[in-house]
Amino acid sequence: MIQLSWSSIILESGNVNDYEVVYPQKVPALLKGGVQNPQPETKYEDTMQYEFQVNGEPVVLHLERNKGLFSEDYTETHYAPDGREITTSPPVQDHCYYHGYFQNEADSSAVISACDGLKGHFKLQGEIYFIEPLKISDSEAHAIYKDENVEEEDETPKICGVTDTTWESDEPIKKTSLLTNTPEQDRYLQAEKYIEFYMVVDNIMYRHYKRNQLVIKRKVYEMINTMNMIYRRLNFHIALIGLEIWSNINEINVQSDVKATLDLFGEWREKKLLPRKRNDNAQLLTGIDFNGTPVGLAYIGSICNPKTSAAVVQDYSKSTRMVAITMAHEMGHNLGMNHDKGFCTCGFNKCVMSTRRTKPAYQFSSCSVREHQRYLLRDRPQCILNKPLSTDIVSPPICGNYFVEVGEECDCGSPADCQSACCNATTCKLQHEAQCDSEECCEKCKFKGAGAECRAAKDDCDLPELCTGQSAECPTDVFQRNGLPCQNNGYCYNGKCPIMTNQCIALRGPGVKVSRDSCFTLNQRTRGCGLCRMEYGRKIPCAAKDVKCGRLFCKKRNSMICNCSISPRDPSYGMVEPGTKCGDGMVCSNRQCVDVKTAY
């Protein structure tokens, strides 16, 4: 039932005090000749167009199904009353979640659920609008409104629980903006990346939605669709690889202590989830009310880590988009981003990595982008580079979704977004006489010659890759062998040259050095921050020969204090990295200092 009070209306997003009623009309979409074979009948179309008015002006909204929303091996898991785990692989490719743009509006975008009318948000002429159906029988009426017209649900501030920040001051991040990347680094940052995302809904939230799994699924799908639009600007695709609903009992002790819940969820992911379902990142969506004002918490710079590539988020708002933005925020921490400082801007009042959640934010600040890029270049997480093969995509190909699928030669996005001179955005075929589009071994629409460098060696431990002259793809990245001397003071390990000094700088900033040897003897004890490793929550000290393979100790200038860095949410934070030199001809392996000749 719709309740009207003057110009106020109660919608799913809350009480809206000013809105416009529109009647979207579906119009026939132009066929994209030569791209797709005739499609079988489906409930939802791959592409749609709607006409309606915004501020009294007619607009045409083009929608394309978000092909990358689900991975090809997507599964759903719930639990029977007797505790049995039930996992299915439902057909989800005929879904109703779309991205889009407005005709003749270059800087426009849309994130829409078309399951039952049009619901979502869109950007038009620099303004963000929201649209949702008015629940009036036999009517196509929809409400369009701005976020400023939605009344606050309550006055309690909603914040992220992350308090540790790697920024000791504003100065280091400002300085990084002056640095320039190498061509190889730029190519790496611009490459498409993929996160196979696993979502868990706890039993408290399940009961809050009256045990209605369909309602929960739709809510989660809308959230992932929104996250996809947010991360597209960073060249990331978020593919939902699994949804798990704890329909019987919680599989961990979900509690009001947000940190404790995150730690337990990370352990559950590592020990219980990953052995049965691969994923790059997982989040727990809970109906519990966390203590204080936090509505989410995540580990920082941990993507691909078995335990710490995780976050927990409270389902704190009626607004699906607000919770989705919090999920995107927490994933941002996993991807190396910290909270925005006062000088960070994104063109709107609020950015995704703002500490407080008051209004929706859909863009990352310049600070977040730099911090994220710095993390990627430093850690080079591997799981995000797994690109799905076109033959793995089981649903019909869609021209304009940035995925090159069966029957396509290129895909540069929609005609409004495409910036390629080599690709026809309407047909997803190469232009006449073009051999390639935007791959590493493609230049001006032609294959680069054999021997052309397509991926430079990053450092002593990397090898350059060369084009073959027969393909637009750069060969697989290869490295120097482990144990090869590098940078005059280290040994190569998995393509990196782990040097203690560099690790100290990464932890504590420029000008930091490795502490004196006597500091490392603290690793023979378990008091303070000294240790070699953790086993079942218990600190294990180092043997005397292994002290330089435990906690890393750093100092500023001529300080005599033994400084260490710890994070209660990440046991590996501040530890000496594997492969680090711990003596002449010796390297760290499994927290032991061993001969480099036998280590690998």
Swiss-Prot record:
Pfam families: ADAM_CR, Disintegrin, Pep_M12B_propep, Reprolysin. The keyword Oxidoreductase does not apply. A motif (D/ECD-tripeptide) lies at residues 460-462. Expressed by the venom gland. Residues 9-179 form a propeptide. PROSITE patterns: ADAM_MEPRO, DISINTEGRIN_2, ZINC_PROTEASE. GO terms for biological process: proteolysis. Ca(2+) 3 binds at residues 462-463, 465, 477-478. Residues 396-482 form the Disintegrin domain. Its EC number is 3.4.24.-. It comes from the Eukaryota. Ca(2+) 2 binds at residues 398, 401, 403, 405, 408, 411. Glycans are attached at residue 424. GO terms for cellular component: extracellular region; plasma membrane. Residues 1-8 form the signal peptide. Ca(2+) 1 binds at residues 196, 280, 383, 386. Binds 1 zinc ion per subunit. The keyword Repeat does not apply. Zn(2+) binds at residues 329, 333, 339. Keywords: Calcium, Complement system impairing toxin, Disulfide bond, Glycoprotein, Hydrolase, Metal-binding, Metalloprotease, Protease, Secreted, Signal, Toxin, Zinc, Zymogen. Its cofactor is Zn(2+). One of its GO terms (molecular function) is metalloendopeptidase activity. Monomer. Snake venom zinc metalloproteinase that may cleave complement protein C3 into C3c-like (C3o). This is Zinc metalloproteinase-disintegrin-like cobrin.
